[in-house]
Each structure stands twice: as C-alpha cells, then as structure tokens.
From Swiss-Prot:
Pfam families reported for this sequence: TSC21 (PF15217)
Origin superkingdom: Eukaryota
Tissues where the protein occurs: Testis-specific. Detected in the germ cell lineage at all stages.
Gene transcribed to yield this protein: SPMIP9
Designated name of the protein: Protein SPMIP9
Xref: InterPro entries: SPMIP9 (IPR029361)
Nucleotide-binding as UniProt keyword: no
Subunit architecture: Microtubule inner protein component of sperm flagellar doublet microtubules.
Length: 180
C-alpha cells in the first residue's frame, strides 16, 4: 500500500533515500538543496566523462602503445597500416592529367610499361585513376632482398578483372583485424 501514511511515520524525503527501484526518479523541484553554477556543472561533466560515466570517445588513430584493445575496433582496415601508394588519398582531387596517366598492370589490355604504352598507340585512349601505381615498372619494384615474402596486387580497374585488389601482407600474422 504505497502512499499510505501511518500514524507516527515521518514522510520520506525521496531526494535522500533512493532505492534501486527508483533509478528513473526525477525530483519534483529542481535544485532542492544546492544550486550549481554553469562553470561548476561543466567541471562536473568533465570529471564524469573522465570516469567513464559517459561513453568514451575512441582515438581515431590508435597507437601500439595503447595496447591491443585499441586495435579491436571492427572498422579498422588496411588503410590504418599507412601504406602509401596503394590507397587513394582522401583529400586529393584527380586532375585531367592524373586521369589520363597510365597506371595499370593488366596485361590483357595494356603493356606493362608507360613508355611501352606511349610507343604502341594513342595515349589518350586509356582513362584511369593515378592512385594505383604500376608495380610492373622497375622503378616501382622494391629491392631484391626486400621483395621476399610479399605478394603485392595493385588495384586494376580494367574490364577484365572487375575487382579492386589490395595488398596481401602474408608475413605479418592474421588478416582478420585488417580485412573485415
């Protein structure tokens, strides 16, 4: 019989006594006992955020010193490894010269070298993005002692392949955190 007051019973102040059943209890009057200034409220909010009462804001650039939990986020991709030359830069706008530059390694449509391609035909017939370098060219190949254990597949936007290839790093452990 809630709400019934028995003789000799003092009224219960709900601001002082709160049970676990009153999680959603809101007091009738705001700031019954103390008034908090906006500066103090901002300071309290910062303290609560530091103590993880709020949802923690993840660092978009995790470091190895942060430990393994920093790398457990599901949206981590191979771009987080920071391999230049394989993935298009987000802030780069393609110009007309970049679109006409020969950059594919597909042997079904084009020769392997840019110079070979210019010697064989019209350089304006191939319209591709310059974000994926041609790894068949010797100037893009790593040194002989560095090229062991790698299988590097650049992106090939030609009609024969129909898929975008990414570098396969077969030396550095499981691919699961980076290729989901």
């Amino acid at each position: 019989m809630a709400g019934v007051k028995y003789p000799g019973q003092d009224p219960v102040d709900l601001d002082i006594y709160q049970s676990s059943h009153m999680v959603d209890y809101q007091p009738y009057r705001k700031h019954k006992y103390s008034r908090v200034t906006p500066q103090e409220q901002a300071k309290l909010d910062a303290q609560l955020r530091d103590k993880e009462f709020y949802r923690p804001i993840p660092n978009p650039n995790p470091k190895l010193t942060d430990g393994y939990p920093a790398f457990k986020r599901p949206h981590m991709t191979a771009k987080d490894l920071g391999l230049p030359g394989f993935f298009p830069s987000q802030e780069h706008e393609a110009t007309r010269e970049d679109e006409r530059k020969f950059t594919s390694t597909c042997h079904f449509t084009y020769p392997a070298s840019h110079d070979l391609h210019l010697a064989q035909g019209d350089p304006n017939q191939v319209l591709q993005s310059a974000d994926f370098p041609c790894l068949v060219d010797p100037k893009h190949q790593p040194a002989a002692e560095m090229a062991k254990g790698y299988l590097l597949l650049p992106g090939c936007p030609c009609l024969h392949c129909h898929i975008v290839k990414v570098p396969i790093l077969n030396r550095w452990g499981p691919l699961m955190p980076f290729y989901q």
